[in-house]
């Protein structure tokens, strides 16, 4: 046995490539690659899915560029500051929020869409014990 020890002899004698699985039945190596996220491996199921996900962002960018061309740089900056201020205000975690002020800033308060009918607060996924939810939000648990 040399000065490196028994572990180094075993490591040198057995190639690592032979121990790794390959082929269609290969399992994910958690120690080397970490946890796998299926969400990152999925492709959009429809060509319009990405467009629908980014619709509001694209709509806001278009409105800001129109405002900048018509009224100058001040109008989109003011509107962006109002958006940031409205998005920072939150209710307690167990109370449903309609984000009415954000809808007013975007002009969505004058339209009726499917989210107005199908977005019933009583069917929310966040229903739970109020005290536990607040303690979790504040980091006390």
UniProtKB/Swiss-Prot annotation:
<keyword id="KW-0472">Membrane</keyword>
<dbReference type="GO" id="GO:0043248">
    <property type="term" value="P:proteasome assembly"/>
</dbReference>
<comment type="similarity">
    <text>Belongs to the POMP/UMP1 family.</text>
</comment>
<keyword id="KW-0492">Microsome</keyword>
<comment type="subunit">
    <text>Constituent of preproteasomes, but not of mature 20S proteasomes. Within the preproteasome, may directly interact with PSMB1/beta6, PSMB4/beta7, PSMB5/beta5, PSMB6/beta1 and PSMB9/beta1i. Interaction with PSMB8/beta5i is controversial. Forms tetramers.</text>
</comment>
<keyword id="KW-0539">Nucleus</keyword>
<dbReference type="GO" id="GO:0005829">
    <property type="term" value="C:cytosol"/>
</dbReference>
<dbReference type="Pfam" id="PF05348">
    <property type="entry name" value="UMP1"/>
</dbReference>
<dbReference type="GO" id="GO:0005634">
    <property type="term" value="C:nucleus"/>
</dbReference>
<dbReference type="GO" id="GO:0016020">
    <property type="term" value="C:membrane"/>
</dbReference>
<keyword id="KW-0256">Endoplasmic reticulum</keyword>
<dbReference type="GO" id="GO:0016607">
    <property type="term" value="C:nuclear speck"/>
</dbReference>
<dbReference type="GO" id="GO:0005737">
    <property type="term" value="C:cytoplasm"/>
</dbReference>
<keyword id="KW-0963">Cytoplasm</keyword>
<dbReference type="InterPro" id="IPR008012">
    <property type="entry name" value="Ump1"/>
</dbReference>
<comment type="function">
    <text>Molecular chaperone essential for the assembly of standard proteasomes and immunoproteasomes. Degraded after completion of proteasome maturation. Mediates the association of 20S preproteasome with the endoplasmic reticulum.</text>
</comment>
<protein>
    <recommendedName>
        <fullName>Proteasome maturation protein</fullName>
    </recommendedName>
</protein>
<keyword id="KW-1017">Isopeptide bond</keyword>
<dbReference type="GO" id="GO:0005783">
    <property type="term" value="C:endoplasmic reticulum"/>
</dbReference>
<keyword id="KW-0832">Ubl conjugation</keyword>
<feature type="cross-link" description="Glycyl lysine isopeptide (Lys-Gly) (interchain with G-Cter in SUMO2)">
    <location>
        <position position="39"/>
    </location>
</feature>
<keyword id="KW-0143">Chaperone</keyword>
């Amino acid at each position: 046995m040399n000065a490196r020890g028994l572990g180094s002899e075993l490591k040198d004698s057995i190639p690592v490539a032979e121990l790794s699985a390959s082929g269609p039945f290969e399992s994910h190596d958690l120690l080397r690659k970490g946890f796998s996220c299926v969400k990152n491996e999925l492709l959009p199921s429809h060509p319009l899915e990405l467009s629908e996900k980014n619709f509001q962002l694209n709509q806001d960018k278009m409105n800001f560029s129109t405002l900048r061309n018509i009224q100058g740089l001040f109008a989109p900056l003011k509107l962006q500051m109002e958006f940031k201020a409205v998005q920072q205000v939150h209710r307690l975690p167990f109370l449903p929020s309609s984000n009415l002020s954000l809808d007013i800033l975007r002009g969505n308060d004058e339209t009726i869409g499917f989210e107005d009918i199908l977005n019933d607060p009583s069917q929310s996924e966040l229903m739970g014990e109020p005290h536990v939810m607040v303690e979790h939000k504040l980091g006390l648990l």
